[in-house]
Structures are given as structure tokens and as C-alpha cells.
Amino acid sequence: MKVRRLWWLALPVVVLALLVAGCGGDDEDEAGGTTAAETTEPQEMTDVTLQLKWVTQGQFAGYYAALEQGYYEDEGLNVTIRPGGPDIVPEQVVLGGQAEFGINWLDNTLATRDQGGTIVNIAQVFARSGMTELTWADSGLEEITDLRGKKVGVWLGGNEHKLFAALTKNGIDPQKDAEIVAQPFDMNLFLNREVDAAAAMTYNELAQVLESKNPDSGELYTLDDLNVFKMSDLGTGALEDGIFVTEEWIADEANQDVATRFLKASFKGWIYCRDNPDDCTQYVLDAGPTLGEGHQRWMVNEINKLIWPNETGIGVMSEADYATTAQIAQDYGIVKNDPGDGVYTTEYAAAAVAALEEEGLDVKGADYEAPEVEVTEGGE
């Protein structure tokens, strides 16, 4: 009752103020006074951090585009993009509160939750897997089953899940039937033929091989020199780059709004990279990657292939795709327990996609066709 009484007491004052403002408005405008638009308070910015899965490179071009194009700022977000590295586990960073958003593969999200980590996927950016295992065409290792008893390189720390699943599916126990070699984050072991097979992402390590010269011919290697075993063809192509947060953080309604705005801006960045790959290559170069322009151009192009076309709209994970990855995780020992509910939500990604559609943007890229990108020596 006290609040209502004060409201009525204040009403005459408000009316009087409006009358005074109405009488004096024209004179103030003529005198060059401040307009209502000019006195509008600037939008309050929210600080958030995005932890990348890996170092600065074309794999993350859409986020750099969102930053450089001002999409995050348009959504009232001051975003810090934090590069990853061999000693950085995105899940640990986010669970530790050093970042609100993290990027990693969906099988890693499942594994983290299986171990008690309270993270949830809120957007599945990559619609397909880019992981492969390479052998030399002249090695006679033409099928995944040929890797029994061979030196098989792969990155560890959770990056081995899909390969181990592929080996297991084909009757090869990774712990007993092959010599697993901890692969550095380059292709030197493979190029020097110190391993029989090596892991390679279509957008990164595969290009590193193609950017290298065959010492016998003096020419760059080509795909004809390689056997490429795609995890997607082998039935173990679990989904890769997705955006995750903690359950505790997303439970806050204010953070749910932040998440939707963050996804909207990020998706808009990826749409921009689909339509303007050269610009996005430059944004990555400006951010200071290790490898050169030619390599980043290849990477942006290959990443676009993993995102587009997207039947459900960028970032919105289909139930079928999730079920496939969850089944792979269960069948091949990536997780010990049934993942259950709560691994992912499409609520915020769907809201972001709907907002972008209202702006007239193409969120599915149904007609997308990747251009040809020339391989350059050394990725320069």
C-alpha cells in the first residue's frame, strides 16, 4: 500500500514536468540542445570469455569474424577469445570459472560428464566429423584392418576416441593389437615414415602433408600419395566442435539471455565466413596463428565444409546426430555409463537461429558449395 500511495503523490509532479518539457522543447532544439537519442545511455556490456579447443587458426574463424565485424558488440557482449594449446583442457578452464564458454568435441563432453563434470553442450557448430587416419599409398595399408600390429600415431588426451573406436569396431584392440604412438601436433613422424599411420584433420594435418615436398620427386605430395581413412566413413565419426557451458552457469536466467546473444553473434560470424572466406582468413591471420596464409585459407574452406549445409540450422543439434555420437561413446568405451539426459540443449541455439532468420540470414546454407583452394608449399 505504501508504494501505491507514493505513486499517486508523484503523479502531479510527472505531469507538470511533461508540460514544461512540451513548452520548452522547440526552443531547445533551435538552440542546438541535446535530443532524446543523444542522451540515451550506452548499452551495458557483459564481459565473457570463450576458451578455444586449440591454438589460433582457421578452425575458429567464425568467432574472430564475430569479433571483428562487431557482432558481439551489437549483442552487448565484450568477448575475450582465449586460445588453447597442448596443455589446456577447455573443460577444466570452464569448470574452473576462467571462461563462460568452451569449445570441444562432443565425445569429450560426454567423457567429461561421465567423470562427473557438470558441462552441457548448448550449440553443435560442426555438423560432421573431419578426423581421418592416413597411410602412404605405397605402404600396402589400404584398409583400417591393415593397421593390426602397426605403429599407429594419434593425439592423446581425448583426441584418440574416434580412432580407438574405429580400431575396436574392426577387431583391433588399441592396447594389444597395435603400437599406439603419441603423435606430436605436427606430421613429422609420418613424413619421415617413423609411423605407419597418423591422425589428421581434413582442415589441418592433411593439408600439412599436402604442403610438403616428396623428396624423391621434388613435387608437393597429392592425395594420390595417400590412403585417407575417414572416421565418418568407418562409422565412428562422432561430432566435433561444439560450444559448452556449465550447468550451474546456464541455470541463471540472466546467463541464458547472454548465451543466446553469444550464439547469435557467433553463428552470424560463421555465416559471414561461409560467404566471405577471404575476409575470415585475414581475421585469423590478424589474430596471429602459427601457420601461414595458404594453410589458413585451406582451413577456413575445409571448416565450412564441416558446417554447411546444415539441415537443422547452424548450431542446432539433431536428436539423430546426438544419438549416433552417444552410441559410439557407449559402444567403444568412451563412457562407462549411460549419458542420460542433460548432455545438451538446443533451446538457446534454436532461439539464436530464429533471431537470425528474422534478420533475413540464411542459417542452413542448403546451396553451399565449397570453392577449390590451392595448396601452397609450406602453407605460405
Which stretches of residues belong to each language-model region?
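C-terminal motif of bacterial Sec signal peptides marking the signal peptidase cleavage site
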Residues: 18-22
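Bacterial lipoprotein signal-peptidase II cleavage site
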Residues: 23-35
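Pocket-lining segment of extracytoplasmic ligand-binding domains
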Residues: 107-108, 185-188, 195-289
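Bacterial N-terminal signal peptides that target proteins for export
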Residues: 1-10
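Short, glycine-/small- and polar/acidic-enriched structural segments
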Residues: 41-184, 188-192, 196-203, 223-225, ...
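A bilobed periplasmic-binding-protein/Venus flytrap-type ligand-binding module shared by bacterial periplasmic
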Residues: 65, 131-141, 239-255, 310
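Conserved C-terminal helix/tail region of periplasmic/extracytoplasmic solute-binding proteins
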Residues: 323-380
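Secondary-structure end/capping motifs
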Residues: 253-336
